[in-house]
Amino acid sequence: MRLGWLRFGLIAAMVALVGIVGVASASRAAEELHLYSLRQEQLIRPLLDAFTKETGIEVKLVSGKDDALLERLKAEGDNSPADVFMTVDAGRLHLAVEAGVLQPIKSETLDKLVPAQYREPSGLWYALSVRARPIMIAKDRVDPSAIKSYLDLADPRWKGKICVRSSGSVYNQSMLDAMIEHYGVEKTEEWAKGLVANFGREPAGGDRDQIKAVAAGECDIALSNSYYLGQLTNSDEESDRAAAAAVTVIWPDQDGFGVHVNVSGAGITKSASNKENAIKLLEFLVSDAAQEIYAGKVYEYPIRDGVPLSPTVEAWGKYKADTLEIAKLGTHNAEAMRIADRAGWR
């Protein structure tokens, strides 16, 4: 009898131990989430580390480039480990919506802190930071008062003076998208043809390269997202700082629609197995602490008012932003690409 009770006790203890281990494993799994991000890791890592420190939730980061990560998410379907999809342009967020890989969420915190202009109406994604795309000119060769609007860049007086990256850049596609929304297809195409006629060189490189080309005298005017100028200004490389010092920022269309702005943003995937943790991450990324990192270390504009800007960004002055609903960027993408093709903007 004693042997029977002993055997029963051992079995019960083993069952209890397995249960404890299972609960512990489930608990550990619940304290993590998987993030697919098109943002460069060195830019997003400080934010993720701060989130983990505050919440104890570990973020498993998978970084990717261009549209490859979205294609991976689509291919994985319901089996994808991704809980959050983060990207750097409203046009790409629109593609994610069209692909059906995001799910709508409800969050009083996000709805309160993220302006309606900067989120998808049904809650499929929320913007996390704002990036402006102003005109940048050579300080010593261009009179700032000579350019008041993006439309001025098509003026023949600037023939051979403009540098801009390829129309394959989603930043330029979204800008064309916004112009179609404001001006219509015909006027946008006319502008694109005039812009191409003024190119100082074939489009090459990224936005930093356009700024450097102005500094080197290859052209006098460039289009670039503003945070790239912030990165060059604060670079460890003397040549980068010199390039940044050679240009100044023009905020166009201040008497009209305002400067073109875009966003970085994120949404919760349909496959999310850590949905609550994923929502916590998005809520953290619009908190004061996270928004100060976006402003101070990434040189972007906070999604909300009241967050101090980087001194570098503040030095560029205030601007009126385009009030176009950001979720509309991407809706004219196919037409924007056709316009670029007809204009010869490669």
Identify the role of each PLM range.
Residues 160-168, 284-308:
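Periplasmic-binding protein-like
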Residues 174, 178-252:
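Ligand-binding pocket segment of bilobal, Venus flytrap-like solute-binding proteins
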Residues 186, 300-346:
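An extracytoplasmic/periplasmic, membrane-proximal ligand-sensing/linker region
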Residues 134-141, 261-274, 293-294:
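A bilobed periplasmic-binding-protein/Venus flytrap-type ligand-binding module shared by bacterial periplasmic
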Residues 80-85, 103-135, 151, 161-164:
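A structural signal for short loop-to-beta-strand junctions that line the ligand-binding cleft
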